[in-house]
Amino acid sequence: MYSPTLIDHFRNPRNAGMMRDPDGVGEGEYQACMDLARFYLRVRDGRVVEARFQTYGCGPTIATSSAGTELAAGQRLEDLAALPDARVEAAVGGLPGERRHAAEVVALAIRAAARDALRRLETARGPENA
């Protein structure tokens, strides 16, 4: 059984689509069912001000991606770089055991996007300001 939150995010996905000139991009993949999530982050002062996603996969992965963008908004990059799968799963009110991969894929993509943004910030600062 799926939660009302997950169903709402599936029926009304938020923040779907690409982002022009993102500050960070990351992907997560679950090869067993070929789910792929790509997250884009826009960052100001070390916090996410906008998150968008492109997801190819099952309904729960699409819905969890939508919820993941809301979860990421306002968060510090350092916190998102260590985002636990369980926190993403909680954002959709839980997932049945056979669909928990949705949270894993989305958390992986968010962590990768946050790490990419952190890497870009370090590069922009240069070694003398690190």
Question: Where are the predicted features?
Answer:
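C-terminal binding/interaction regions
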Residues: 1-20, 25-27, 49, 75-130
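Short acidic/polar alpha-helix capping motifs at helix-coil junctions
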Residues: 2-4, 31-32, 53-55
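Short connector loops at helix/strand junctions that flank enzyme active sites
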Residues: 21, 34-36, 48, 63
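Short beta-strand elements
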Residues: 30, 35-45
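Short, thiol/selenol-centered motifs that function as redox-active sites or metal-ligating centers
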Residues: 33, 55-64
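Alpha-helical support elements that line or immediately flank enzyme active sites
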Residues: 60-75
